[in-house]
Curated annotation (Swiss-Prot):
Specific enzymatic cleavages in vivo yield mature proteins. Envelope glycoproteins are synthesized as an inactive precursor that is N-glycosylated and processed likely by host cell furin or by a furin-like protease in the Golgi to yield the mature SU and TM proteins. The cleavage site between SU and TM requires the minimal sequence [KR]-X-[KR]-R. This is Envelope glycoprotein gp160. Residues 695-745, 786-821 form a coiled coil. It comes from the Viruses. Residues 1-106 form the signal peptide. A lipid is attached at residue 862 (S-palmitoyl cysteine). GO terms for biological process: symbiont entry into host cell; virion attachment to host cell. GO terms for cellular component: host cell plasma membrane; membrane; viral envelope; virion membrane. The surface protein (SU) attaches the virus to the host cell by binding to its receptor. This interaction triggers the refolding of the transmembrane protein (TM) and is thought to activate its fusogenic potential by unmasking its fusion peptide. Fusion occurs at the host cell plasma membrane. The transmembrane protein (TM) acts as a class I viral fusion protein. Under the current model, the protein has at least 3 conformational states: pre-fusion native state, pre-hairpin intermediate state, and post-fusion hairpin state. During viral and target cell membrane fusion, the coiled coil regions (heptad repeats) assume a trimer-of-hairpins structure, positioning the fusion peptide in close proximity to the C-terminal region of the ectodomain. The formation of this structure appears to drive apposition and subsequent fusion of viral and target cell membranes. The record marks 662-663 as: Cleavage. Residues 663-683 are annotated as: Fusion peptide. Keywords: Cleavage on pair of basic residues, Coiled coil, Disulfide bond, Glycoprotein, Host cell membrane, Host membrane, Host-virus interaction, Lipoprotein, Membrane, Palmitate, Signal, Transmembrane, Transmembrane helix, Viral attachment to host cell, Viral envelope protein, Virion, Virus entry into host cell. Glycans are attached at residues 140, 161, 206, 258, 298, 364, 381, 387, 403, 435, 439, 470, 475, 481, 491, 501, 515, 527, 537, 542-543, 551, 568, 703, 771, 778, 794, 828. The gene is env.
Length: 989
């Protein structure tokens, strides 16, 4: 027996559930299927379709006004779809025509692109560049094994700009370093060629001229090109910024390059294909080399403040720490020592990755004097460093087999008979054909320099590192709170190398110059207590201190054997430098190795020149990144500027006329599209509103149907229960009847019960009766009544809910309007479409503009014809004089009195032509002109009366006032050409 609940349940116990229960999705699918079947059955009926939902009127008032059946509804539906399709096709055609006209009007700029199709911006990044095939392109392709220049597109004409967002998405503001194998392969070919021809050099003389000289000297220039499916991404704008600042030492672990503008090309710029080691390069390479002088990004860096860091930030290309110049696969090209100056590992070779970041830039030799850097004369005698920089390559340099001076104006060239290719030296037994004795002032030169402390983001100034005994405790000389990442948080009042205990707990060595300028800060996480314990453990340093003694600029400690502790070559702590006799090692404090045994005196190293063609190409190729594309097409559109300039005024006028016509057509198209868009918007809004109401009504109808389904299920359960109770009642009545019957039989048989058995003297067949114990577990009449009451309550509640849902469904169904009523209810279309009444005026205006345009065209044609008819062209006539020529000059007869004898004969005035004479002359000119023999006869013949009137007005004035003038006109017979009389003498037009 179940307990009564607040929410009605569909059944009272599990055994009373119906045998099949359908889900809500199945019910909806069944409803949709039935609705579709009804629509298919009723499509062919003339009476039309009825409503697909059923409304139940609980109030007993059925709707009397049934909608009339629209027999044209199927036709209207298909007709509307056809109209919409036609409008869409018309709109697409109009847009296509518009785009075609716009494309036709725009002229190409002789600039074609490479169409890249891939992810995310048309390309994929290639990280392993050694697997990319490459070829060279040059003019002398048959001699050097390259392809001709036309084999690949010119990158200056055919490229594609890559957006900044795509660059940031692909490269994450990190333009990486790539060790390209292409220059290494060329260097390998040169080495192989030199080894194969080494025996032949001994037989050659200085007069022998080899074509290989052009290649060795770098005169053979070409491009590197990659085939499909690869391309090159050439950077156009870039800058550098620091990354991963070490909080202990303050140096930047990485210097990243952010490329903000790039182009996709197929070939690189022109560069020397091969060359030996040299100092200066040709002026053709100056722009490419200058591009590698990368500036710092416009972010908050200390080096950008000229007041804090004189000279600004570093400019150049940073070869990252850990880069391999010559990979392991081509280790035979390394040689014993690096010939590239600062481009070397910690052992001075190229076997290991770089341990220090190396900067390469085009040198600025403007401040050099006699081949030496600025302030070189102020250095200590014999020293190779000045202003914190140790210079290599000052003096004698190796250039294309010659020893030259670092002073370009001296012109020293001593041929050594040796050529350096990479790390190997090859003999060259005859003098090359090139000349190096010229003044190479103004030629671009590579400069390789290293910041050993790697604090380029803080300052570009190089310093002389402090020795470990030239320090003092900064008591009272350092004020403020500064750190390795914040040099501006403190001030110094005295020059020196001050050992300072920072607020973070570590030790700092603050380098102060000029009593107030902080030029560097070196730090470590080791605190003062730990350092002092190490210091006290040094031999004979128990009573010593690090206080400053002496009056020098830097000062020193009292005992040189008790300087700042460091780790010796055995990695043990010591406070004294190693000695050998009277000589003592100079040990310095380094920013990245505070406790190490550092012997580098200067924080910077610089090298001038010394790069061969391999490194030259390697540096220029860092501007490019290899990408992989799915497909690209080349196309060259040659539209020279002279082609456009050669067009005459005729073509320009026709083009302007076409543009005006296109403008009028575009206005008409836009007006039509606006009308179509307005109609489409209205129908779309109406459809949306009607769909919204329909969706609500259908949802309510579904809810009502669900409630009715629950009522039916509950009724079915109640009927089952009643039927079961009736069967039980029948069984009980039958049992009572049988019991009474048997009792009567027992009485008649005179039997008695003994242990549930009937003992009688009658036969056993008569006394064998049915056992009725199986009915003992049946429910009682009281339980049955309780279940019936629960069913009645459940059924009544479900009926009330079903009635409410049906009422809501009726209300929502009545709210479903037709399309136009939905539009009127959603928007105030009376004001929205008030402009529709002006459509006839708009159409009239457009038609008027078209008519006005046609009229203007006709008038322009008439004016052109009028100008041609008005301007009378005279024919050239050759006059043959048959009368004899009088050689003697006769006395002139001057009738105007200039000779003293005036003529008394009245002067004959030329009378003005009458209107009839002008008409005859004009008509005769018209008949003999070519205008009357074409289709333009009728438009032009209407101009003849106006032309005659105009000529008559020119001769007689606007109202004939020229005839009434009595003033004698002056006639200049020499300067004025008289017009022949048209009534007698006619000229040919």
């Amino acid at each position: 027996m179940t307990s009564k609940e607040s929410k009605p349940s569909r059944t009272t116990w599990r055994g009373m559930e119906p045998p099949l229960r359908e889900t809500w999705n199945q019910v909806l699918q069944e409803l949709v299927k039935r609705q579709q079947q009804e629509e298919e059955e009723q499509q062919g009926l003339v009476s039309g379709k009825k409503k697909s939902w059923v409304s139940i009127d609980l109030l007993g008032t059925e709707g009397k006004d049934i909608k009339k059946v629209n027999i044209w509804e199927p036709c209207e539906k298909w007709f509307a779809q056809v109209i919409w399709g036609v409008l869409w096709v018309l709109q697409i055609v109009l847009w296509g025509c518009l785009m075609w006209e716009m494309r036709k009007g725009n002229q190409c700029q002789a600039e074609e692109v490479i169409a890249l199709v891939s992810d995310p911006g048309g390309f994929q990044r290639v990280q392993h560049v050694e697997t990319v095939p490459v070829t060279c392109v040059t003019k002398n392709f048959t001699q050097w094994g390259c392809q001709p220049e036309g084999a690949y597109p010119d990158p200056e004409l055919e490229y594609r700009n890559i957006s900044r967002e795509i660059l940031e998405e692909v490269y994450k503001q990190d333009w990486p370093w790539n060790t390209y194998h292409w220059p290494l392969w060329q260097m390998e070919n040169m080495r192989q060629w030199m080894k194969e021809n080494e025996k032949e050099y001994k037989e050659r003389t200085n007069k022998t001229k080899e074509d290989i000289d052009d290649l060795v000297a770098g005169r053979i220039r070409g491009r590197f090109c990659v085939p499909y499916p690869y391309a090159l991404l050439r950077c156009e704008e870039w800058c550098w910024y620091p990354e991963s600042i070490n909080q202990e030492t303050g140096h930047a672990e990485k210097i990243k390059i952010n490329c903000t503008k790039a182009k996709a090309v197929s070939c690189t710029e022109k560069m020397p294909l091969a060359a030996v080691q040299r100092v200066y390069w040709e002026k053709e390479d100056e722009e490419s080399m200058k591009f590698l002088n990368i500036k710092a990004c416009n972010i908050s860096l200390r080096c950008q403040d000229e007041g804090k860091s004189p000279g600004g930030c570093v400019q150049g290309y940073p070869i990252p720490k850990g880069a391999e110049i010559i990979p392991e696969a081509m280790k035979y090209l390394r040689g014993k020592k690096s010939r590239y100056g600062g481009i070397k590992d910690k052992n001075g070779e190229l076997k290991l990755p770089l341990s220090v970041r190396v900067w390469v830039r085009m040198a600025n030799l403007s401040g050099w004097v006699n081949g030496t850097p600025p302030y070189w004369s102020a250095r200590v005698n014999g020293s190779t460093g000045i202003n914190g920089t140790r210079w290599y390559g000052v003096g004698t340099l190796h250039h294309l087999g010659y020893n030259i001076s670092s002073n370009p104006e001296r012109g020293i060239c001593d041929f050594t008979g040796e050529l350096w290719i990479g790390g190997d030296k090859f003999p060259y037994y005859y003098k090359p054909s090139w000349n190096c004795s010229q003044n190479w002032t103004g030629h671009p030169v590579w400069q390789v320099f290293r910041y050993l402390d790697m604090t380029e983001h803080m300052t570009s100034r190089c310093i002389q590192r402090p020795e470990r005994h030239n320090i003092t405790v900064g008591n009272g000389t350092i004020t403020g709170n500064c750190s390795v990442t914040n040099w501006d948080g403190c001030n110094c009042t005295r020059s020196g190398n001050h050992l300072y205990n920072s607020t973070s707990g570590g030790l700092l060595v603050i380098i102060c110059r000029q009593n107030s300028t902080i030029t560097g800060i070196m730090g470590t996480n080791t605190n003062w207590t730990t350092m002092w314990n190490i210091y006290q453990n040094c031999s004979k340093c128990n009573n010593s201190s690090l206080d400053r003694t002496g009056n020098g600029t830097l000062g020193t400690v009292n005992d040189l054997k008790c300087s700042l502790p460091h780790r010796n070559e055995s990695n043990k702590w010591t406070c004294a430098a190693r000695r050998k006799g009277s000589r003592r090692d100079s040990l310095y404090i380094a920013g990245r190795d505070f406790w190490g045994r550092v012997k580098a005196k200067y924080s910077c190293e610089s090298n001038l020149g010394g790069l061969d063609s391999m490194m030259h190409q390697q540096m220029l190729l860092q501007r490019y990144q290899v990408i992989r594309v799915r497909a690209y097409t080349y196309g060259v559109v040659e539209m020279p500027q002279s082609y456009m300039e050669a067009q005459g005024e005729n073509r320009r006028s026709r083009r302007n006329l076409q543009r005006k016509k296109r403008g009028i057509g575009l206005v008409i198209v836009l007006a039509i599209m606006a009308i179509i868009a307005a109609a489409g918007a209205g129908l779309g809004v109406a459809n949306a509103v009607q769909q919204s109401y329909t969706r609500t009504a259908v949802q309510s109808l579904a809810n009502a149907t669900a409630a009715q389904q629950e009522v039916l299920e509950a009724s079915y359960a109640m009927v089952q229960h009643i039927a079961k109770g009736i069967r039980i009642l029948e069984a009980r009545v039958a049992r009572v009847e049988a019991l009474v019957d048997r009792m009567m039989v027992y009485h008649e048989l005179d039997c008695w019960h003994y242990q549930h058995y009937c003992v009688t003297s009658t036969r056993s067949e008569v006394a064998n009766y049915v056992n009725w114990t199986r009915f003992k577990d049946n429910c009682t009449w009281q339980q049955w009544e309780e279940e019936i009451e629960q069913h009645e309550g459940n059924l009544s509640l479900l009926l009330r809910e079903a009635a409410l849902q049906v009422h809501i469904a009726q209300r929502d169904a009545r709210r479903i309007p037709d399309a136009w009523k939905a539009i009127q209810e959603a928007f105030n279309w009376s004001s929205w479409f008030s402009w529709l009444k002006y459509i006839p005026w708009i159409i009239m205006g457009i038609v008027g503009l078209i008519c006005f345009r046609i009229l203007m065209c006709v008038i322009s044609m008439c004016l052109q014809a009028y100008k041609q008819v008005k301007q009378i062209r005279y024919t050239q006539v050759t006059v043959v004089i048959e009368a004899p020529v009088e050689l003697e000059e006769k006395q002139k007869r001057n009738g105007d009195g200039t000779n003293g004898c005036a003529s008394l004969e009245r002067e004959r005035r030329t009378s003005h032509r009458s209107f009839i004479q002008i008409w005859r002359a004009t008509w005769w000119a018209w008949k003999t002109s070519p205008w009357r023999h074409s289709w333009r006869t009728m438009p032009y013949i209407t101009l003849l009366p106006m032309l005659v009137i105009w000529q008559w007005m020119e001769e007689n004035g606007w109202n004939g006032e020229n005839q009434h003038k009595k003033k004698k006109e002056r006639v200049d017979c020499q300067d004025r050409e008289q017009m022949p009389t048209l009534e007698n003498d006619y000229v040919e037009l």
